[in-house]
């Protein structure tokens, strides 16, 4: 399985390395690439691995991001709503889309439980048609999510119906 998580940090190299190290250190996961962009204040990581090892590495990296990234102090050109903005899974080498969808739900549920961060599923994992398009979920970004998340149609798929104070959604 391949995963390309996006983190809302592209400027602080120490924070970037702490997040990326979670992928480097995990057996069964291979870090293929990562790049940061200061203007967008974003880190994009590309990793592959067996689903269980990938899930473990992601949970550690997401935990690190929740701890290190404060969106109340964040600025950048890219729309964002969370310290970890997206976690797309791409089925490769014998993995199916159904397995990718199942993994996205497992990770989302675990993130919400461990870090008290609300999670929205999108694209093929979406729980409703109006959530398939990521732009619709992102509309309002971090600042607007506090009110949006209280609307019944924007109740998170997992986690509390309130924005995490610093990590967003």
Question: Which role does the model predict for each range below?
Answer:
Residues 1-169:
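Long, contiguous binding/interaction regions
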């Amino acid at each position: 399985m391949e995963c390309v998580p996006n983190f809302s940090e592209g400027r602080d190299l120490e924070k970037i390395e702490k997040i990326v190290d979670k992928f480097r250190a995990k057996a069964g996961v291979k870090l293929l690439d990562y790049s940061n962009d200061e203007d967008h204040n974003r880190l994009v990581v590309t990793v592959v691995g067996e689903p269980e090892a990938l899930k473990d590495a992601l949970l550690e990296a997401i935990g690190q991001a929740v701890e290190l990234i404060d969106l109340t102090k964040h600025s950048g050109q890219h729309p964002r709503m969370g310290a970890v903005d997206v976690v797309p899974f791409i089925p490769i080498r014998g993995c199916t889309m159904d397995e990718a969808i199942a993994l996205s739900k497992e990770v989302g549920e675990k993130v919400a439980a461990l870090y008290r961060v609300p999670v929205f599923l999108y694209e093929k994992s979406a729980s409703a048609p109006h959530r398939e398009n990521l732009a619709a979920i992102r509309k309002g970004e971090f600042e607007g999510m506090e009110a949006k998340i209280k609307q019944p149609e924007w109740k998170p798929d997992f986690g509390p119906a309130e924005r995490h104070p610093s990590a967003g959604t």
